Amino acid sequence: MSELKLPSIDYVALAPTLILLGAALVGVLVEAFVPRRLRHMVQLTVAMLAVLSALTMVVVNANDRLITIGGAIAVDGPALFLQGAILVLAAMALLLIGERSVERGGAFVAQAAVTAESADDRRQAEGRPGATEVYPLTSFAVGGMLIFVAANDLLTMFIALEVLSLPLYLLCALARRRRLLSQEAAMKYFLLGAYASAFFLFGVALVYGYTAGVPDRAAGVDFATIDAAVSESQSSSVLLFGGMALIAIGLLFKAAAAPFHVWTPDVYQGAPTPITGFMAACTKVAAFGALLRVFHVAFEGARWDFTPILGVVAVLTMLVGAVLAVTQTDIKRLLAYSSIANAGYLLVGVLAPSSEGVSGTMFYLVAYGFSVLAAFAVVTLVRDGDGEATHLSRWAGLGQRSPFYAGLFTFILLAFAGIPLTSGFTSKFAVFSAAFDGGQGWLVVAGVLTSMVLAFPYLRVVVLMWLSEPGESTPAVVMPGWLTSAALTIGVVATLVLGVVPQPLLDLAAGAAEFVR
């Protein structure tokens, strides 16, 4: 009887993910056994300590370059860099999620099943403590993201996709204000996400069939097997290109790229604003981390086949995001279309055929994550008696009512527009220069032109805040608690520093741009 051979597992390399998933389980136990009055502080402490501990382990593993768990997980430069980015941005998002002083009772419904005006709902409105399931759900989502960017086979990537997606569907439905809008957004996200996951899984099946057609090789969906099958090019190209297309649909949905972006405006508008910021920053890092690994490792041999098609998707994404952002009258929907346009710019970096494209994309993800979290931090502060005032007409004259926070938001919008000495300029320059050097000049031209269009809605908000007279409906900016103040400070400072002194992070990204194979 042959001895069972188990795959080798490097638990130190997997420590960041294990810490986050373990913290999520601890959070479930806290919800069950810790007294209600203590839960919020305990949950926030557990989640934040887990994120910081996982980040410490990423730093400890910085020099590791290995594949573990039988080829399922790759620990390499891009995986570690993106895991670190996700954890830093998740810590910043937790500061927004944990804020309770901006709105009495917090931004989240006490329990997902609580109906409006019920006894539990009134209890929360009085400032009494409620349930805190938002923290373990966030930890589960972050844990899934850490696996997603390090997955070395398509089935592991699919499992990670579900682990990160399912908590997000629930988190989107937990808004305390505009509850029906929040639940509608979550339902749309869930249904469309289920379709996208089905496309991804069907694509995995087609790619497996493609690898099975290679003579003298075992079939599989790990990236090394796929790369070898693509290099030999003896199987049916219909299976390969069909599988690539379906897998790309699943990943582009998470990245909010056109034409798979339709969920983004509704979900960004309906979800609790801290969760919107979390998704805009961390989910985008995870999605593009997976895109980089799939197209630079598994399907690298088919680069010249998929580049024109994904290039068209990138241009369409930039156009849709920039043009439709001009028509928006809600600040969260405007930021949603801005996120879509930025997904197009990131695709330009993904398609650059060099390590500079990988490093530029990773730098862009970090820079954009800090800026967009800072933007949503400001959005949480502009409010009236009914909650956040997100309609643009309500922002008229905000610069006269609250010049400090209007000034911070103006700076962030200028960074989104790509003004020099901001992270928006350096990040766009990084991906555009890599694409231009790789012969993708047409994508650079499209990126520059759409950036000019996208600057208009940003400047319109700036003009509205500073050059319009405040009306009776102009809301006040509430004083933030220390958690929101910390998140806003980190985001604004990072946006400035990465615009003025970007080289250290660019060098770090360049040194982490090589995949293990």
Swiss-Prot record:
Membrane topology according to the record: Multi-pass membrane protein
Any one GO biological process: ATP synthesis coupled electron transport
GO MF annotations in UniProt: NADH dehydrogenase (ubiquinone) activity; NADH:ubiquinone reductase (non-electrogenic) activity; quinone binding
GO terms under cellular component: plasma membrane
S-S pairs: none
UniProt main location, coarse: membrane
Reactions this protein catalyses: a quinone + NADH + 5 H(+)(in) = a quinol + NAD(+) + 4 H(+)(out)
Enzyme class: translocase
Family matches, as InterPro entries: NADH-Q_OxRdtase_suN/2, ND/Mrp_TM
Localization (cell): Cell membrane
Pfam families xrefs: Proton_antipo_M
Alphabetic keyword roster: Cell membrane, Membrane, NAD, Quinone, Translocase, Transmembrane, Transmembrane helix, Transport
Segments crossing the lipid bilayer: 14-34, 40-60, 77-97, 131-151, 154-174, 189-209, 238-258, 272-292, 306-326, 334-354, 362-382, 404-424, 451-471, 481-501
EC number annotated for this UniProt entry: 7.1.1.-
Family: Belongs to the complex I subunit 2 family.
HAMAP family linked to this entry: NDH1_NuoN_1 (MF_00445)
Protein's job: NDH-1 shuttles electrons from NADH, via FMN and iron-sulfur (Fe-S) centers, to quinones in the respiratory chain. The immediate electron acceptor for the enzyme in this species is believed to be a menaquinone. Couples the redox reaction to proton translocation (for every two electrons transferred, four hydrogen ions are translocated across the cytoplasmic membrane), and thus conserves the redox energy in a proton gradient.
Subunit structure: NDH-1 is composed of 14 different subunits. Subunits NuoA, H, J, K, L, M, N constitute the membrane sector of the complex.
Record-given protein name: NADH-quinone oxidoreductase subunit N
Gene assigned in the entry: nuoN
